[in-house]
């Protein structure tokens, strides 16, 4: 892992930080070292939240190769006993959730897209390509780091080199940028793959849970350091914190914030600034409910066009 100080969206170095930990699962599975302290930062300029700890390309490859497969599930369940087989297998595979996400996507882009002009569609980081609306485009492609088998009618792009040689009329990146250590670099790559006048649709979780009980000072840092030396206590506090965050949308007293797969927490302002900085202009945006299990989940959808 490496650390950053500047906001990945607006590049400001003015921020407020709270102590957090690198999740035990992430530390052992991807980083291959014991969990450690990090910080959750909130940019004072654009209100973007992000962890200062970022994954290297090698760590990303370890995390997403065989994503949600047997080894992934076993290691994550070891450190997060509440992460069940039902949750693991249901992510991206629940027909109701897929329908909700596709409907949210169509609600955003249909008023702005001439389907007759959309030939090639890319779902970047799109698992099996199951979220590509059937009505959109003729040639459908998915670029995915995991080993997921594409849906019928969806063509898998096998490498960065192949992707960079192609052009598309519509690109989707749903549930991607929250995972990225360098989101601006990803958007710059996608910009180079778009035909002139084409559209990019971004969706990210809209996660703005309360962090008031996560401390900034030495006392809270010492508390987290003590937890790191007692794995059973760390797992217990992690469970307590996750339950409060999911049910109450707040980190509880003596709870903790952990750096997990989501490194970034966008709102409309920060996403707009990031898109404009990387050569896009925002066309439309919406916040939509996209899942109801194990709790209500909202996503921020933004449609952007090349400037």
Report each predicted region and the residues it spans.
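S-adenosyl-L-methionine-dependent methyltransferase catalytic module, highlighting the catalytic core
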Residues: 181-195, 199-307
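Acidic-residue sensor for enzyme active/binding pockets
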Residues: 144, 178, 261
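Conserved N-terminal segment of class I S-adenosyl-L-methionine
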Residues: 1-174, 185-187, 286-290, 295-303, ...
């Amino acid at each position: 892992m490496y650390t950053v100080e500047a906001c990945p969206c607006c590049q400001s170095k003015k921020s407020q930080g709270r102590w957090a930990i690198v999740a035990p699962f992430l530390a052992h599975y991807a980083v291959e070292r014991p969990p450690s302290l990090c910080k959750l930062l909130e940019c004072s300029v654009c209100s973007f939240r992000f962890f200062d700890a970022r994954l290297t390309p090698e760590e990303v490859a370890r995390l997403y190769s065989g994503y949600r497969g047997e080894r992934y599930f076993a290691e994550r369940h070891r450190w997060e006993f509440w992460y069940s087989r039902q949750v693991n297998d249901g992510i991206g595979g629940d027909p109701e959730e897929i329908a909700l996400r596709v409907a949210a996507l169509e609600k955003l882009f249909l008023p702005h897209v001439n389907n007759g002009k959309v030939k090639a569609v890319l779902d970047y980081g799109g698992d099996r390509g199951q979220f590509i609306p059937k009505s959109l485009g003729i040639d459908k492609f998915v670029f995915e780091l995991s080993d997921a088998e594409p849906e019928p009618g969806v063509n898998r792009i096998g490498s960065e080199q192949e992707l960079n040689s192609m052009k598309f009329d519509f690109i989707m990146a749903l549930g991607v940028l929250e995972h990225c250590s360098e989101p601006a670099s990803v958007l710059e790559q996608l910009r180079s793959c778009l035909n002139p006048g084409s559209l990019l649709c971004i969706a990210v979780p809209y996660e703005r849970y309360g962090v008031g009980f996560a401390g900034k000072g030495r006392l809270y840092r010492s508390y987290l350091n003590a937890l790191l030396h007692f794995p059973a206590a760390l797992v217990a506090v992690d469970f307590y914190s996750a339950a409060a965050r999911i049910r109450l949308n707040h980190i509880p007293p003596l709870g903790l914030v952990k750096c997990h797969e989501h490194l970034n927490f966008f709102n409309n302002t920060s996403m707009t600034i990031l898109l404009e900085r990387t050569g896009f202009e925002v066309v439309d945006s919406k916040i939509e409910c996209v899942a109801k299990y194990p709790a209500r989940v909202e996503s921020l959808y933004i449609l952007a066009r090349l400037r």
